[in-house]
């Protein structure tokens, strides 16, 4: 049985408590960088003591995600507004947004990340050596994660 792992139709819904309380949809994803990136996390740290016994411990970790969008798109403009509203500087206050992102997958499943903050972004445009404006990247960190299962069975 074949498995359809196509990402076509993927979108994000981004809500920020102060700047975008109603939220906005992100779907103008970059073609030269991973649109939605979730790095792997270590759930435990392992070591050996002097007698050769394994010692393990776990500690909470921030759940990080990166979204890459087409420069100048409406999605880029909204994410740029969110980034700038939360960037501090001399004489500039942060909006202190609490961010929630819902990832809407083509198979009907969703992932919700909550208790988040925007923590990286780009304060301007960059140009690649090929002459193309670089995709815009925005990073987030979250405290919580939940998911719903697919509504479309694999292989259909």
Predicted segments with their positions:
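Short coil/turn segments at secondary-structure boundaries
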Residues: 115-116, 153
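Generic beta-strand structural signal
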Residues: 65, 95-101, 136-138
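Short, surface-exposed beta-strand/loop "edge" segments at domain boundaries and coil↔beta transitions
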Residues: 18-24, 75-76, 104-114, 148-149
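Solvent-exposed edge beta-strands and adjacent loop segments
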Residues: 1-74, 117-136
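Short intrinsically disordered coil segments
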Residues: 82-88, 133, 153-156
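C-terminal partner/receptor-binding element of secreted or periplasmic proteins
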Residues: 40, 135-155
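Short, conserved turn/kink motifs that form compact alpha/beta structural patches or helix kinks used as
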Residues: 61-63, 67-93
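Short, acidic/charged, Gly/Pro-enriched secondary-structure junctions
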Residues: 81-112
């Amino acid at each position: 049985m074949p498995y359809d792992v196509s990402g076509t139709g993927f979108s994000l819904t981004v809500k920020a408590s102060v700047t975008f309380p109603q939220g906005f949809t992100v779907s103008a994803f970059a073609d030269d960088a991973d649109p939605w990136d979730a790095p792997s996390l270590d759930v435990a740290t392992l070591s050996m003591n002097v007698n050769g016994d394994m010692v393990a411990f776990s500690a909470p970790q921030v759940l990080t995600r990166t979204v890459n969008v087409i420069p100048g798109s409406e999605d880029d403009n909204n994410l740029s507004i969110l980034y700038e509203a939360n960037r501090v500087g001399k004489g500039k206050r942060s909006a202190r947004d609490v961010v929630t992102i819902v990832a809407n997958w083509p198979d009907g499943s969703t992932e919700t990340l909550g208790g988040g903050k925007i923590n990286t972004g780009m304060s301007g445009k960059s140009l690649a050596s090929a002459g193309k404006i670089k995709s815009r990247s925005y990073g987030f960190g979250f405290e919580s994660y939940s998911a719903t299962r697919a509504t479309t069975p694999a292989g259909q």
